[in-house]
Amino acid sequence: MPQRANTLTLGTDRALYVGEIPATGWHCHASPVLLMGLSGRFALHWGAGRMETCRSALVAAGVEHLFDPRGEVVALVYLEPDSPEARSLRGVFQRQGGVLPDVAAPVGARAAIEGHLRAFDLPALLHRYLLQAAPPLDPRVARSLHVLRRPQQAPGRLARAGLASGVQLSASRFNHLFRAEMGVSLRSYRVWSQVRLAMAGLAVSPRLTDAALHGDFADSAHFSRMFRQTFGMTPSSVLKPLKQVTLLD
């Protein structure tokens, strides 16, 4: 069991998990993630037998990997693909590959690092060359994200056809636009969005069954399958140790 209070902070376009977690299985998700070892080095596996032990790493959306904290306290910063930081990282991922080890700039004491993490201050945490100017998100994709992130407010519009008609595009054109703007498929992002919404439900109720319903999953078994596919871990191993869930406006 974790030795410290694990915490989860969720914002509209970013999330932070801090604490001790088990090693994951192979998985990929529809958002880039910054991994940081707060108390020591972790192991990261990807590709055809590639492995690094490091104190920090960036993993692009859609890249299959295995993360082993090796018992250390870690921080995981998930950036929605439309966030300014995620968009500014797309260029360096395209040039250097989907996994970038040892990306953190020297910050100093662990307390300072955790302060920057809680503020989601990536420019203070990462080497400057990693973050580059990116064009604004297409407003049609931005409108579809508003619907995807609030499924209870738009029943029946979460299917590809409904989202496409909402921005006056054909389904195939919308699919192409979404992937071009977000870097991930609509299908992958829809699952990711549901899992995030389910985790936000933990701020209201600690029961995983209630979280599954909050995420618009058919049942807790469906939620569990999608969670394992997304994070490579069971929901209970990650969410039950949480002592604090904070939702940001």
Predicted regions and their residues:
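N-terminal regulatory/effector-sensing and dimerization cores
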Residues: 2-94
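Short, Lys/Arg-enriched N-terminal segment that forms or immediately precedes the first helix
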Residues: 16-19, 125-133, 175-182
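Compact structured core domains
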Residues: 60-62, 66-149
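DNA-binding recognition helix and immediately preceding turn/loop
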Residues: 137-185, 206-215
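Short hydrophobic/aromatic patch on the recognition helix
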Residues: 174, 178, 222-223, 227
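Terminal helix-turn-helix DNA-binding modules in bacterial transcription factors
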Residues: 180-218, 240-249
